[in-house]
């Protein structure tokens, strides 16, 4: 049977207090120099590398489920239909691709709500910084958006350290298999 982790009152409050004009997720933006990536950058390669790393982070494969009759805070359960394609996206900056355009697109992406039927995170590869192609050694921005109900500052930093590495030859993380059994809330 699947282990259920109930949200604390504090974490649940981030869900309850969220509105359409006040999303309560946290975002980080990483700027990467793709000329330092062994073998170069491609979006499909980045997505494939993320797929390996996300297999080691169960939090990124869990979604919320309401408690029986919705009498208590929601619980985290394995998303049995988890699909990385729903979470990792690619977008190009309009010319000239400077700080103003990057800030505008990041602000827009940050204003969009997360789909509560899925794990509460998204990642966006933002290509075209300074009008350069990241496949040809240009810079790349990566915006990661995670709901505050799922992470706090320390947890977010730990997750980012699992997703990213500064060692190009670092071994892949050990996968954590999906929970066995069926979702007891179904």
Can you describe what each PLM-predicted range is?
Residues 1-186:
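Non-catalytic N-terminal regions of enzymes
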